[in-house]
Amino acid sequence: MTEYTPDEKLRLHQLRKLRRRWLKDQELSHREPVLPPQKMGPMEKFWNTFLENKSPWRKMVHGVYQKSIFVFTHILVPAWIIHYYMKYHVSEKPYGIVETKPRIFPGDTILETGEVIPPMKEFPDQHH
């Protein structure tokens, strides 16, 4: 086996040194990671400032607010959607479904009035 040449030894030494430096750079200091501040929406900002004073009535108001949001999103909105679907898509509309009327031929009797349909007139000059 041949030994490394001086250039190869120098290159290996530099690569090891570079690797050690890279690994050391990967360690985080006690100040890292620096995260950007969270941006709050207007409602979240309001409730955070409202609940800073932890009085019982404020907690109750917040609880009522949360329950009303739950009722609105999980009960009322689905109920409205179901009501709309039932009203406009499922229930039978008066005159919504039109059926073809049965054919009437000469000699037939109309059930509602009892009227008998008279025979058709003969038209000798026209071909049928």
From Swiss-Prot:
UniProt family annotation: Belongs to the complex I NDUFB6 subunit family.
Gene field: NDUFB6
Highest taxon of the lineage: Eukaryota
Membrane-crossing residue ranges in chain numbering: 68-86
N6-acetyllysine PTM sites in chain numbering: 24
Membrane topology: Single-pass membrane protein
Protein name: NADH dehydrogenase [ubiquinone] 1 beta subcomplex subunit 6
Function: Accessory subunit of the mitochondrial membrane respiratory chain NADH dehydrogenase (Complex I), that is believed not to be involved in catalysis. Complex I functions in the transfer of electrons from NADH to the respiratory chain. The immediate electron acceptor for the enzyme is believed to be ubiquinone.
PTM annotation (N-acetylthreonine): residues: 2
Organism lineage: Eukaryota, Metazoa, Chordata, Craniata, Vertebrata
